[in-house]
Curated annotation (Swiss-Prot):
Residues 1-99 are annotated as: Disordered. Participates in transcription elongation, termination and antitermination. Keywords: Transcription, Transcription antitermination, Transcription regulation, Transcription termination. It comes from Streptomyces coelicolor (strain ATCC BAA-471 / A3(2) / M145). InterPro entries: KOW, NGN, NGN-like_dom, NGN_dom_sf, NusG-like, Rib_uL2_dom2, Transcrpt_antiterm_NusG, Transcrpt_antiterm_NusG_bac_CS. It comes from the Bacteria. It holds the Pfam family NusG. The lineage of its organism: Bacteria, Bacillati, Actinomycetota, Actinomycetes, Kitasatosporales. This is Transcription termination/antitermination protein NusG. GO terms for cellular component: cytosol. Residues 14-41, 47-97 have a biased composition (Acidic residues). Belongs to the NusG family. HAMAP family: NusG. Gene3D superfamilies: 2.30.30.30, NusG, N-terminal domain (3.30.70.940).
Length: 300
C-alpha cells in the first residue's frame, strides 16, 4: 500500500522537472528568437551598408563624371582660346616717334652734353682725336661720346649736281661727359680744340631739348632708312638743302647767250632744281624781269 504522503512528495518533484523543462524550452526558444533577431538585424545592417556603399559609389561616379565633363569643357575652352590666339595675332605696340625715342634714349645716358669750338674743317679730326685720348689717358669713365652732327645737301657747281654730307654745325663738336678738372683738361688740350662754348672754365651743359634738336635730323633719317630696309623698299627721298656754289642772290652777272646776250643782270632768285635764275635786265632804261639758265650767264 502506497503512502499517500510519498505520492504527494513525488508529484511536486515531477512538477518541478516539468517546470524546469518548460523554462529551458522557453529559454531555448528565446535564444533562438534572439539569434534569429540578431541575424535579421545583421542582414538589415548588411543590406543598409550595401545600399550606402552603392550610394557612395554612385555619388563618386557622378562626381567623377562631372569632373570629367568640366575638364572636357575647360579643354575645349582652352583650345578655342588657342585657336583665337592663332587666328588673331597680338596687336603690336605702335613704334615710338623717332624724336621721342631719341629723347628717351638721351634721358638715361650718363653725363651731360657740352659744345666745344674747333678750327674750321677740323670737326671730324677733333672727334677722332678726343675718342683716342679718352682711352689712352684713362678717362673713359668721364668722357663718353663725341658727335659731329651732319646733314645731306645737294651742291651744284659748274652745272654739275652732287649730293654730299656736310657738318651741320661747322666749327663745333658735341661732347657727352662728366665735367671734372681731369676731363676738362683732356678735352681742352685736344689738338684742334679752341675751347668750350660758354664759360671757358665752367661751361654750361646743353638742355635735353637743345641736344634733341641738334641730333633729331640724323635720328629721323636713320629710322626712315631702317623702316624701308625692313620692308624691302628703297630709302625714302628726303627734302635736302640745295646749294648753288656758282651763284648767289644779289650777284651781278653777264648774259652770254640768248636774246639778252651782253646785257648785265642782277640775280634775285635761284631755282637749283631747274638750274635757272630769275634776275633783272635793263632794257631801254627800264629793269625787266627775266629767267635765265645757268649756262646763259657768267658771274662778273
Amino acid at each position: 500500500m502506497s503512502d499517500p504522503n510519498v505520492n504527494d512528495a513525488i508529484e511536486p518533484v515531477e512538477s518541478v522537472e516539468d517546470e524546469l523543462g518548460t523554462v529551458e524550452g522557453a529559454d531555448n526558444e528565446d535564444t533562438e528568437a534572439s539569434a534569429e533577431a540578431e541575424a535579421a538585424d545583421d542582414t538589415v545592417v548588411a543590406e543598409t551598408d550595401e545600399d550606402a556603399t552603392d550610394a557612395e559609389a554612385d555619388e563618386t561616379a557622378e562626381a567623377t563624371d562631372a569632373e570629367a565633363t568640366e575638364a572636357e569643357a575647360d579643354a575645349d575652352a582652352d583650345a578655342a582660346e588657342a585657336e583665337e590666339s592663332e587666328e588673331e595675332p597680338e596687336a603690336e605696340e605702335p613704334e615710338l616717334d623717332p624724336i621721342e625715342k631719341l629723347r628717351q634714349e638721351l634721358r638715361v645716358l650718363p653725363g651731360e652734353w657740352y659744345v666745344i669750338h674747333t678750327y674750321a674743317g677740323y670737326e671730324n679730326r677733333v672727334k677722332t682725336n678726343l675718342e683716342q685720348r679718352a682711352v689712352s689717358l684713362n678717362v673713359e669713365d668721364y668722357i663718353f661720346q663725341a658727335e659731329v652732327p651732319q646733314e645731306e645737301v645737294v651742291q651744284i657747281k659748274n652745272g654739275d649736281r652732287k649730293t654730299i654730307r656736310q657738318n651741320k654745325l661747322p666749327g663745333y663738336v658735341l661732347v657727352r661727359m662728366d665735367l671734372t678738372n681731369e676731363s676738362w683738361g683732356v678735352v681742352r688740350n685736344t689738338p684742334g680744340v679752341t675751347g668750350f662754348v660758354g664759360n671757358a672754365y665752367d661751361p654750361y651743359p646743353l638742355t635735353l631739348d637743345e641736344i634733341v634738336k641738334m641730333l633729331a635730323p640724323e635720328a629721323e633719317e636713320k629710322a626712315a632708312r631702317e623702316a624701308a630696309e625692313a620692308e624691302g623698299k628703297p630709302a625714302p627721298q628726303r627734302k635736302v638743302e640745295v646749294q648753288v656754289l656758282d651763284f648767289e642772290v644779289g650777284d651781278s652777272v653777264t648774259v652770254t647767250d640768248g636774246p639778252f646776250a651782253t646785257l648785265q643782270a642782277t640775280i634775285n632768285e635761284i631755282n637749283a632744281d631747274s638750274k635757272k635764275v630769275k634776275g633783272l635786265v635793263e632794257i631801254f632804261g627800264r629793269e625787266t624781269p627775266v629767267e635765265l639758265s645757268f649756262d646763259q650767264i657768267q658771274k662778273n
